[in-house]
A protein has these predicted regions:
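Conserved alpha-helix/loop element of class I SAM-dependent methyltransferases that forms part
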Residues: 46-59
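Leucine-rich tandem repeat or coiled-coil scaffolds
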Residues: 2-4
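Short, conserved micro-motifs enriched in small and acidic residues
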Residues: 39-43, 47
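S-adenosylmethionine/decaboxylated-SAM
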Residues: 7-40, 57, 62-146
Length: 146
C-alpha cells in the first residue's frame, strides 16, 4: 500500500529511529521510557483504545480482533485488560488473522490512494506474537490469551 505520510512525516520517523538506535541505553530501558520515542499518532491510537476499553469494562464477554497484522491492537487489548480488570476470569482476548495478507483484491476494493494490493498486510509476526503472549501471561495476575 502506498504510504499516506508526507515526506516530512516519513523523515520524522527516520529521525526517531536513528535516535532510538543510537541511544546507549539498554533496549529494555528505552521501552520503559517509550513516550520519548513513540510518535504522537501511535500514542494517540493507544489512548483511544484505552478510552474504548474503559467503556466496555462493565460489559461481559470476550474481545475479538479480526486482522491482527503485527499485533498492536490485540496486545493493547490484552494489556489493558490486565491493567484495568486483573481479576476478570471471564474476559478473553482472541485474535484472528491468516498472516498471509490479501489473497486477491477486486476492483471494488480499490477505492483510492490507500487501496490494498494482493499480499498486502502479509507479516511474519505470528511466531513473535505467540512468544509475546507467553511472556505477557508470565507477567500478569491471570492469563487471558489462550
Amino acid at each position: 500500500m502506498k504510504s499516506l505520510a508526507t515526506e516530512t512525516e516519513q523523515e520524522v520517523g527516520k529521525s526517531i529511529e536513528s535516535i532510538f538506535v543510537n541511544c546507549p541505553d539498554r533496549i529494555e530501558t528505552k521501552l520503559e521510557n517509550f513516550p520519548k520515542y513513540v510518535r504522537r499518532q501511535h500514542l494517540k491510537r493507544f489512548l483511544a483504545m484505552y478510552e474504548i476499553f474503559k467503556m466496555i469494562l462493565r460489559v461481559k464477554g470476550s474481545i475479538v480482533e479480526c486482522g491482527v497484522f503485527r499485533g498492536f491492537s490485540v496486545m493493547a487489548w490484552a494489556k489493558l485488560s490486565a491493567i484495568l480488570e486483573p481479576e476478570n476470569l471471564t474476559r478473553r482476548i482472541y485474535g484472528f488473522d491468516t498472516f498471509a495478507g490479501f489473497p486477491s483484491v477486486s476492483g471494488e476494493d480499490r477505492t483510492g490512494a490507500g487501496s490494498a494490493e494482493p499480499g498486502e498486510f502479509q507479516t511474519a509476526s505470528y511466531e513473535e506474537l505467540l512468544e509475546l503472549i507467553r511472556v505477557h501471561d508470565q507477567d500478569r495476575f491471570l492469563g487471558h490469551l489462550p
